[in-house]
């Protein structure tokens, strides 16, 4: 399902970002055409100050290599086209989370590099966006929590010491929530619309009805997955702040089932966080419970979610029906 969502969602996202990034875009270490002479001469990685996990060798190398090439006067462009190949995603939730946390550790190393004045401004923006990609989950949780606490205790801006400027405009919270949802789902909705309007693409997905049905299911899947990842990444950032990181090893790409025991061992903390959120609001503000469903449903269901999404019979059934075709 995630790969299906990436197929149409990333096409529209990449098309838009490639337009404004122009010749100073990012580079990913797959499906790339590289000027080897320039890459060897100008793409060498710096060694970061300090010890791992924040210092030492650069882990997320490709973005830094792109910025180094831009500094030397070369272009790095993203071509938002499909050429018949793509990178496979991890086959189960534990491996998916492991890869994301590995990237999180690598991207947060960019805090040492983003301020370099001799690098292209667009390249520095790319590094800043890569950092924010992983800080955004924690920021989202803080934003939602503060909003719910404010509502639960009936506080306005003038009663909260952290806001000395008084009460915010009445519609600001709603506008922020709408903006957040729009930024999250707009690329996928645009990609679905593009595929529906293109007869060849529509047929490659199994037809319009199959595309729309799978698109709705994938959106629901994404709504469960997003808060799971936000909690997992927030916990991991806290771990990084204590100097503990992950070993950078290759990810598993072969499909495998996740047992109840493994799912429980890996995700009990995320489930507990979701339960704390639900119990807290049930006690303090039961009227707000409906609003925390998007945040708490994924963490509460993470263990059966990790188990169910790796069942061989489910994968065979979806593939046999060409559901969520990629």
Question: What are the functions of these language-model segments?
Answer:
Residues 84-85, 248, 323:
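Generic preference for hydrophobic/aromatic residues in regular secondary structure cores
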Residues 307-326:
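Cytosolic/matrix-facing juxtamembrane and C-terminal tails of multi-pass cellular membrane proteins
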Residues 1-118:
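Internal catalytic domains of large membrane-associated glycosyltransferases
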Residues 22, 89-289:
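Basic/Trp-rich segment in TM-proximal cytosolic loops or flexible interdomain/linker regions
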Residues 182-185, 291-311:
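Alpha-helical membrane-embedded segments
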């Amino acid at each position: 399902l995630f790969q299906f969502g990436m197929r149409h969602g990333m096409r529209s996202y990449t098309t838009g970002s490639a337009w404004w990034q122009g010749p100073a875009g990012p580079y990913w270490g797959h499906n790339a055409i590289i000027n080897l002479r320039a890459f060897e001469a100008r793409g060498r990685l710096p060694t970061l100050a300090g010890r791992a996990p924040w210092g030492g060798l650069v882990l997320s190398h490709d973005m830094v290599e792109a910025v180094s090439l831009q500094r030397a006067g070369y272009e790095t462009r993203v071509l938002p086209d499909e050429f018949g190949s793509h990178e496979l995603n991890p086959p189960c939730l534990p491996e998916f989370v492991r890869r994301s946390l590995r990237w999180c550790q690598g991207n947060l190393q960019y805090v040492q590099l983003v301020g370099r004045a001799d690098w292209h401004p667009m390249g520095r923006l790319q590094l800043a966006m890569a950092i924010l990609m992983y800080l955004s989950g924690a920021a989202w949780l803080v934003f939602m929590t503060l909003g719910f606490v404010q509502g639960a205790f009936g506080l306005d801006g003038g009663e909260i010491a952290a806001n000395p400027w008084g009460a915010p405009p009445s519609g600001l919270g709603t506008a922020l929530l709408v903006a957040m949802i729009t930024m999250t789902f707009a690329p996928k909705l645009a990609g679905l619309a593009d595929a529906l309007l293109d007869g060849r693409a529509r047929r490659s997905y199994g037809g319009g009805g199959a595309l729309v049905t799978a698109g709705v299911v994938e959106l629901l899947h994404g709504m469960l997955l997003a808060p799971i990842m936000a909690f997992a990444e927030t916990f991991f950032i806290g771990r990084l702040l204590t100097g503990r990181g992950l070993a950078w090893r290759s990810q598993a790409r072969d499909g495998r089932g996740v047992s109840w025991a493994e799912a429980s061992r890996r995700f009990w903390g995320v489930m507990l966080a979701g339960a704390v959120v639900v119990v807290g609001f049930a006690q303090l503000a039961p009227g707000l419970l409906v609003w925390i469903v998007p945040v708490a449903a994924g963490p509460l269901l993470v263990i059966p979610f990790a188990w169910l999404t790796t069942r061989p019979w489910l994968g065979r059934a979806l593939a046999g029906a060409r559901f969520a075709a990629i």
